Amino acid sequence: MFIPKKTKYKKDFKGRISGNAKGGYTLAFGTYGLKSLEPGRLTSKQVESARRSISRTLKRVGKVWIRVFCHTPVSKKPMDVRMGKGKGSIEMWVCKVKPGKILFEISGVSLNLAKEALQKSQAKLPVKCKFISDEL
């Protein structure tokens, strides 16, 4: 799955997701894309699930680019453990997504097939997204 090989720090602060995307808001590789409309956190499992649904719909036709990567660790303490005694262990990896960020790109397929694939993947993600195109 999508986790970094090495990080500078083992654990991160929770932080807030404010403002719009400062980069990665235009199509760079493909002709069609999926753009986020609201802020949120995507887990590596959600990104992988969306990627699988896209590749199943396309059936070896065209090319897919994943424009997000899960850099941020999320820690969690086990159940029935009292407060204190340090921060919990890493539970999952997430990527913080701002409004306007391109999540996936596709090229080499028809408009209808691209729309279908990206709408199926959109159902797997916790943020609202919209289909965008170079051609439109």
Curated annotation (Swiss-Prot):
A Pfam match: Ribosomal_L16
Record carries keyword ATP-binding: no
Keyword Lyase: no
GO cellular component: ribonucleoprotein complex; ribosome
GO process annotations (BP): translation
InterPro entries named among the record's database cross-references: Ribosomal_uL16 (IPR047873), Ribosomal_uL16_bact-type (IPR000114), Ribosomal_uL16_CS (IPR020798), Ribosomal_uL16_dom (IPR016180), Ribosomal_uL16_sf (IPR036920)
Keywords associated with the record: Repeat, Ribonucleoprotein, Ribosomal protein, RNA-binding, rRNA-binding, tRNA-binding
Matches recorded under NCBIfam families: rplP_bact (TIGR01164)
Function as written in the Swiss-Prot or TrEMBL entry: Binds 23S rRNA and is also seen to make contacts with the A and possibly P site tRNAs.
Annotated HAMAP family: Ribosomal_uL16
Subunit comment: Part of the 50S ribosomal subunit.
Protein's name according to its UniProt entry: Large ribosomal subunit protein uL16
Taxonomy of the source species: Bacteria, Pseudomonadati, Pseudomonadota, Alphaproteobacteria, Rickettsiales
Gene: rplP
